[in-house]
From Swiss-Prot:
Comp. bias regions, Basic residues: 1-19
Name of this protein: Large ribosomal subunit protein bL34
Quaternary structure (record): Part of the 50S ribosomal subunit.
PROSITE patterns tied to this protein: RIBOSOMAL_L34
PANTHER family cross-referenced by the UniProt entry: LARGE RIBOSOMAL SUBUNIT PROTEIN BL34M, MITOCHONDRIAL RIBOSOMAL PROTEIN 34 FAMILY MEMBER
Short name of any one Pfam family annotated for the protein: Ribosomal_L34
Biological process per Gene Ontology, one example term: translation
Key words, A-Z: Ribonucleoprotein, Ribosomal protein
Organism listed in the record: Bacillus subtilis (strain 168)
């Protein structure tokens, strides 16, 4: 059986990256929430 995690940095950035977060309203809400919580890393 194939494992579920098949690392791929390009896909990682496209799905979870900063620019993809900024491109939608809900993504911006995610970043705002993480800033408020005090996360050192906001996105992948």
């Amino acid at each position: 059986m194939k494992r579920t995690f098949q690392p791929n940095n390009r896909k990682r950035s496209k799905v979870h990256g900063f620019r993809s977060r900024m491109s939608s309203k809900n993504g911006r809400l995610v970043l705002a929430r993480r800033r408020r919580k005090g996360r050192k890393v906001l996105s992948a």
